[in-house]
C-alpha cells in the first residue's frame, strides 16, 4: 500500500449501498501491452481478491471498460495525444478484453469513450438508480482513468474509497510507474477519496458477514 497517506478520511461500506468498481482492467493496460503498466497483473489480482470477499457478503460489482466501435469513438481530446487509441482498444481485440475471472454474470458493465467514466458515460446515473452512495475503486491506470473517474465520482457527491494496491500506473515522463502511481494516490487521498489497501478492505468485509455455526 502507499505510505504516509495524507488524508484521514474513512468511509463505511454497506452491501446495499456500496459498489466495488473496476476501471479498465483490460489486457491493453497490462504489462507488455499497448499501455505499459508493469504492476497491472498484481493490481488486478488484488481486485479479484477484494471482489471475492465482497460478493460473499452480497455486494454488487461493476466494471468500467474502454472499448471502441465505429458507433462509440474516442471523445474529448484523447486522439490529439493518442491518435491510434481507437484501434488499440477496438472491440474484438485482445487489448479490449477484460482480465479473466473478473466480470461475472449480473455485474454492471459500463463502456466509456474518454478517461473519466463520469464525463463519458451514464455511470453516475446508473449507480444512483441502484441507491449507491459509496464506490470502492481499483483499476488501471492510477493517474489517468482511475484518477479522473474518482475525481468525477467525488464531485458528483458519491463517497469514494480507492484500493491503492488494486491500482497500477505506467511510467509518465520522468516519473517511474511506481512514482506516478504514488503521486496519483496521494493526490486522490488529499481531497477526493479515502485510501486503503485490499487487505484492510477484505478484513472490513469479512466483519460484515454473519458468523457461521
Describe every region a protein language model picked out.
Residues 29-39, 135-138:
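Surface-exposed cleft-lining segments at the edges of enzyme active sites
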Amino acid at each position: 500500500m502507499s505510505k504516509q497517506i495524507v488524508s484521514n478520511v474513512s468511509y463505511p461500506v454497506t452491501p446495499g449501498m456500496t459498489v466495488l468498481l473496476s476501471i479498465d482492467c483490460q489486457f491493453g493496460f497490462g504489462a507488455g501491452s499497448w499501455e505499459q503498466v508493469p504492476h497491472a497483473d498484481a493490481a488486478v489480482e488484488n481486485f479479484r481478491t477484494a471482489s471475492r470477499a465482497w460478493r460473499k457478503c452480497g455486494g454488487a460489482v461493476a466494471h468500467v471498460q474502454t472499448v471502441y466501435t465505429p458507433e462509440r469513438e474516442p471523445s474529448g481530446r484523447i486522439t490529439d495525444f493518442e491518435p491510434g487509441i481507437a484501434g488499440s482498444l477496438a472491440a474484438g481485440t485482445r487489448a479490449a478484453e477484460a482480465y479473466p475471472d473478473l466480470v461475472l454474470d449480473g455485474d454492471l458493465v459500463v463502456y466509456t469513450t474518454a478517461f473519466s467514466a463520469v464525463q463519458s458515460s451514464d455511470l453516475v446515473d446508473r449507480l444512483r438508480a441502484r441507491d449507491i452512495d459509496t464506490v470502492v475503486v481499483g483499476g488501471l491506470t492510477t493517474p489517468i482513468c482511475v484518477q479522473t473517474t474518482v475525481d468525477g465520482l467525488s464531485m458528483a457527491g458519491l463517497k469514494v474509497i480507492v484500493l491503492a494496491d488494486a491500482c497500477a500506473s505506467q511510467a509518465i515522463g520522468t516519473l517511474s510507474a511506481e512514482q506516478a502511481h504514488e503521486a496519483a494516490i496521494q493526490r486522490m487521498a488529499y481531497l477526493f477519496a479515502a485510501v486503503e489497501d485490499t487487505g484492510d478492505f477484505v478484513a472490513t468485509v469479512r466483519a460484515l458477514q454473519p458468523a457461521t455455526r
